[in-house]
Amino acid sequence: MEHDTSSNGNCRERILEAAGEIFAEFGFRGATVRKICERAKVNIAAINYYFGGKEKLYSEVLRHWHDFAIKKYPLFFGVGEDAPVEEQLRGFIRSFLFRLLDKGKPAWFGKLMMREMTEPTRAFERLVKEIVRPRDKVLASLVGKMIGTPVSEEEIRLCCASIIGQCLYYYNARSIIKRLYRQDVTQPDEIERIADHVMQFSLKGLEHNSKHSEDRTKIEAESQISDPMTGSSPRIPHSAREIDPVF
């Protein structure tokens, strides 16, 4: 099959956009090469020519549109890395929510990502390695700085999950929210309002977690102080050692 090289870029872009829509709608297994080519208005052999098959196309769709979304909504939403950590966290939350909820191009990207999380394909490992894990490390670093005192990896992970979970709720429940409260969470002003709420709610949780960690560190330090008369550590009442867990 001959291809007009002058239109190669345009053809490739049409395939990527059409494939993203089809994969988001039907999933990897339900999407067919024929459906994608019909949507893109290209020859059925074009997918093999440009991408080497459906599976490689799927991986490229995830990478291409994630890069597009990050370019549109950078990880910190324009907040500099030298900005206060609280502002960086706010930027992170805003960016994540806009990538999930924005109705602009590509509006289907959030749906496609959710599909991959719930119905993993062979592209899942690459998705985790190139997209999810780097984002997770950034958020974990911010959370650790916000808490301030030494905390376990598990505690940081729980805090990160709580922040991400709040954001995902508004994506997964957007239809129910609209029906119950007549609130369209895909509108920019609503996304900003949600971001403010998630930020404030998360700040309170992180502050409580920080105090919890400080109290525990203090108790552990006191337990190591030896009694000058006996040379043994004083007994701390059981109730004083038990600090209510945050989560």
Q: What are the language-model segments listed below?
A:
Residues P74-F109, I156-I163:
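Hydrophobic alpha-helical connector segments
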Residues R14, I22-K56, E60, H64:
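Helix-turn-helix
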Residues G104-R126, R174-L180:
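Amphipathic alpha-helical segments used for helix-helix packing
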Residues G9-E17, Y50-G78, E125, K129:
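An amphipathic alpha-helix adjacent to DNA-recognition modules
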Residues I15-F23, I163, S202:
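Short hydrophobic clusters on alpha-helical segments that form packing/core surfaces
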